[in-house]
Design a protein with these regions (language model features):
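Ser/Thr-rich, low-complexity intrinsically disordered terminal regions
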Residues: 1-117
Length: 117
């Protein structure tokens, strides 16, 4: 299955992205990205994480969740509490950066590194 990721900004605080990967790979990528950001997290259920993440030097609270779909996994990143003074465009950039970090991790691990082997 070769399905391109499809991102849909919901509002400035939320982004949904359908990734062409199995749910377990997306969950693993979330753990790896949270570790890379040095972020502590709370696992709310089997599909949702809450975390304080510093993006571009601004620490904000995010919800990151996954939902398995017929053709991949839907990743939803929502900024629950922005850093004080963060503009709407700053919020959108931060949400996009977190979603892109997860997507890029998956691409690197499952696509690019496989080609190098």
């Amino acid at each position: 299955m070769n399905v391109a990721p499809h991102s849909v900004p919901q509002d400035s605080n939320t982004m949904k992205t359908t990734l062409p990967y199995n749910r377990k790979y997306v969950l693993f990528a979330i753990y790896e990205v949270l570790d890379k950001f040095g972020s502590k997290y709370e696992k709310m259920d089997s599909s949702t994480f809450l975390s304080e993440i510093s993006v571009y030097g601004n620490k904000s609270r995010f919800s990151i969740s996954v939902d398995e779909q017929p053709f991949g996994t839907e990743l939803t990143v929502t900024m629950l509490r922005p850093c004080e003074g963060l503009s709407d465009s700053g919020i959108q950039r931060s949400v996009t950066a977190v979603a892109d970090s997860i997507s890029q991790y998956l691409e690197n691990e499952l696509e690019i590194n496989r080609l190098k082997a």
